[in-house]
Design a protein with these regions (language model features):
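Active-site loop/oxyanion-hole signature of alpha/beta-hydrolase fold enzymes
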Residues: 4-6, 31-39, 43-86, 241
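Conserved alpha/beta-hydrolase catalytic His-Asp/Glu region
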Residues: 125-188
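Catalytic histidine neighborhood in serine/cysteine hydrolases
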Residues: 206, 210-229
Length: 249
C-alpha cells in the first residue's frame, strides 16, 4: 500500500486529511495539494488505492469495499477521525464512508462529485477491452471547453497502458456505475461538507451538483468558473483556498 504524506512525517497529534483520487488515477493528481495542506498543520494521506500506481493487489470492485479499506487504513495508523477530500469517484467513497462511519469522519470535501455516477456503456466497454478510446471519452466529457491544459491533458499520462485501462479504470468505472445507495447515504451525512464544482464539467453538471448540495445537512457549495471535471489540476490554487477557508471554520 502506497501513501504519500506530502513530505511531512505522520504525527498522531495533528488532524489528518485523506486525499482520495478518482477512477483509474493515482495520488499524483494531488501533487499541487499535498504540501499545501501539510503546511497548514494537517497530516496528509494521499493514497494509491489497491491496484493503482504504486499499490499492489487487485483493484477493489465496489465503493463499499473502498470505504472499508479506508477504515482499515485508519485502524492501522491509529487515526480516530479523518477529513476526506475526494475527487470524482473519491467523492462517492467520501459519501459512502460518511454515511456508514459517521463517528470516524470530522469533515468532508466533495470535488466534482455526485451521489450517483452512472457510466456510459460505451465507456465501460472500451475500458474493459483495454481500449484507449475510454480515456479519450473521459477527457472529452470531463474537460471539453476547459483551456487549463497546456501541453496535453495529464489524465492520459497517468492511464497510459491497455492493462491499466482494463484492470484498473474498468473496475473503477463499474464500481461507480454499480453504486446505488447515494441518495440514502446523503441523508445520513452529519459532518460539515463542502461541495466544489466546475461550471464546465459535463460529467457532473451543475444542476446535478446543486441537487446534491440541497440534500446534505450542514453543507456549502463553491462553483469554480472556467473549469471542467479535473478541478484539482485546472484550478488547484482556487480550490485550495476554498478548502482552507472551509477547514478553518
Amino acid at each position: 500500500m502506497f501513501v504519500s504524506t506530502g513530505g511531512i512525517d505522520f504525527d498522531k497529534k495533528k488532524p489528518s486529511i485523506l486525499l482520495m483520487h478518482g477512477s483509474g488515477l493515482t495520488h499524483i493528481v494531488w501533487s499541487l495539494h499535498e504540501q499545501f495542506y501539510a503546511s497548514q498543520g494537517f497530516n496528509i494521506l494521499s493514497v494509491d488505492l489497491p491496484g493503482h500506481g504504486n499499490s499492489e493487489g487487485p483493484s477493489l470492485e465496489s465503493i463499499e469495499q473502498i470505504s472499508n479499506w479506508v477504515k482499515s487504513l485508519m485502524n492501522v495508523l491509529g487515526i480516530k477521525k479523518i477529513i476526506i477530500i475526494g475527487h470524482s469517484q473519491g467523492s462517492l467513497v467520501g459519501i459512502d464512508f460518511a454515511s456508514r462511519y459517521p463517528d470516524l469522519i470530522s469533515s468532508l470535501v466533495l470535488v466534482a462529485g455526485s451521489y450517483k455516477m452512472p457510466v456510459n456503456q460505451d465507456l465501460i466497454n472500451y475500458a474493459e477491452a483495454g481500449d484507449e478510446k475510454a480515456v479519450l471519452l473521459m477527457m472529452k466529457w470531463g474537460y471539453e471547453g476547459s483551456k487549463a491544459f497546456i501541453g496535453g491533458n495529464p489524465v492520459k499520462k497517468i492511464i497510459n497502458s491497455s492493462r491499466e485501462i482494463r484492470e484498473v479504470l474498468a473496475v473503477d468505472l463499474n464500481a461507480c456505475n454499480n453504486y446505488k445507495d447515494g441518495k440514502e447515504s446523503l441523508e445520513k451525512i452529519n459532518c460539515p461538507t463542502l461541495c466544489i464544482f466546475g461550471d464546465l464539467d459535463k460529467m457532473v453538471p451543475l444542476e446535478v451538483g446543486n441537487k446534491m448540495v440541497s440534500m446534505i445537512k450542514n453543507s456549502e457549495k463553491k462553483i469554480i468558473n472556467n473549469c471542467g471535471h479535473m478541478i484539482i489540476f485546472e484550478k488547484a490554487f482556487e480550490m485550495r483556498k476554498s478548502v482552507k477557508e472551509f477547514l478553518s471554520k
